[in-house]
């Protein structure tokens, strides 16, 4: 059994931390039944994963993609362009309709201050000691 070291793999994967992540992910894949690309030689899954990386029987870029997909909680979905899909609220309206015709009631500063004067602050509740 040949000993696999980080130096055997570091020229294939530049960062040691990435190497550990990729090897661990590959070892989990092997544990879940993924096909081996080299002979096991009575080695455990992490050693087999490192040997596969060192012998370049698997692509580190493919492993990185698989790792990212396995860690994603939400799958990205390409949304259709907004100009090709009509808006939900505009069933009878055309796509080119101008949405700036929203009626907004304007309030002057004096009206706002009069409204605020009518508001009373909430009553303070006495704190209970335990």
From Swiss-Prot:
SMART domains: RNA_pol_Rpb6 (SM01409). The keyword Membrane does not apply. GO terms for molecular function: DNA binding; DNA-directed RNA polymerase activity. Pfam families: RNA_pol_Rpb6 (PF01192). Keywords: DNA-directed RNA polymerase, Nucleotidyltransferase, Transcription, Transferase. GO terms for biological process: DNA-templated transcription. One of its GO terms (cellular component) is DNA-directed RNA polymerase complex. Its EC number is 2.7.7.6. Residues 79-98, 108-130 are annotated as: Disordered. It catalyses: RNA(n) + a ribonucleoside 5'-triphosphate = RNA(n+1) + diphosphate. It comes from the Bacteria. The RNAP catalytic core consists of 2 alpha, 1 beta, 1 beta' and 1 omega subunit. When a sigma factor is associated with the core the holoenzyme is formed, which can initiate transcription. Promotes RNA polymerase assembly. Latches the N- and C-terminal regions of the beta' subunit thereby facilitating its interaction with the beta and alpha subunits. Belongs to the RNA polymerase subunit omega family. This is DNA-directed RNA polymerase subunit omega. It comes from Nitrobacter winogradskyi (strain ATCC 25391 / DSM 10237 / CIP 104748 / NCIMB 11846 / Nb-255).
């Amino acid at each position: 059994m040949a000993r696999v070291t980080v130096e055997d793999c570091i020229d294939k994967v530049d960062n040691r931390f990435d190497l550990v992540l990729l090897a661990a992910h590959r070892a989990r894949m092997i544990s879940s039944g993924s096909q081996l690309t080299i002979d096991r030689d009575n080695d455990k899954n992490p050693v087999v994963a490192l040997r596969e990386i060192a012998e370049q029987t698997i692509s580190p870029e493919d492993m990185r993609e698989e790792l990212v997909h396995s860690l994603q909680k939400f799958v990205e979905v390409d949304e259709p362009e907004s100009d090709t899909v009509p808006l939900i609220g505009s069933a009878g309206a055309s796509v080119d309709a101008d949405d700036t015709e929203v009626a907004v009631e304007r309030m002057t500063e004096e009206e706002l201050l009069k409204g605020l004067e009518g508001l009373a602050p909430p009553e303070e509740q006495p704190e209970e000691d335990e």
